[in-house]
Amino acid sequence: IVDNLMTKYPGIAYFKWDCNSPITNIYSPYLKDQQSHLYIEHVKGLYNVLERVKAKYPNLPMMLCSGGGGRSDYEALKYFTEFWPSDNTDPIERIFIQWGYSHFFPSKTMAAHVTSWNKNASVKFRTDVAMMGKLGFDIRIHDMTPAEQEYCKGAVKNFNRLGSAILDGDLYRLVSPYEGNHSAVMYVNEATDKAVLFAFDIHPRYAETLQPVRLQGLAPEAQYEIKEINLLPDTK
């Protein structure tokens, strides 16, 4: 199928490989030998297909979907550029999902998209949360205001500029969302001359106490310029 599509439409730039259909009614009392191996052989067969796809199209980016169905595995990283961790793209829930996911896979494998889930959350909040992984947009552009569209353009530029830190840097989990009402993570690039801090007030409350966050991973002898980014137009 992949080869047929790439032959007909060589301009295809990206594949989403979805695996949501479970295998049902697979066992039989008449087939005695090695029935318990079915899932093992199925996965081996999948890898065999992916090996052929990768050999013929080595530079084709592919996302492995069905993140909630056990498709996020280390072997698949040989063939896919990213995983879809969950169909739950509510930005508040994603703070928790991405925190847990980060204990097993690096940020560059985590497809994190801005969607229309939780429209009570601003486009800025949704985008900032998604920038902790591989940023993408699954949202109707025409439903956004001109200011929101302009904001997203700037956020994409910032993401591309800071990609070496976010996607390839060291991750520091500073404040766990599971231990309070806030969350903070930090990425530092290999040269320790660039870092990105993400800090979120998950459920803002009146007169709540905000504790300072101690940064990590920076060079102790260096001086850094701190700048807030991803601001909406006309916001200082």
Predicted feature residues:
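Short conserved micro-motifs at the rims of enzyme active sites and ligand-binding pockets
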Residues: 115-116, 208-211, 227-228
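Carbohydrate-binding surface patches
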Residues: 176-220
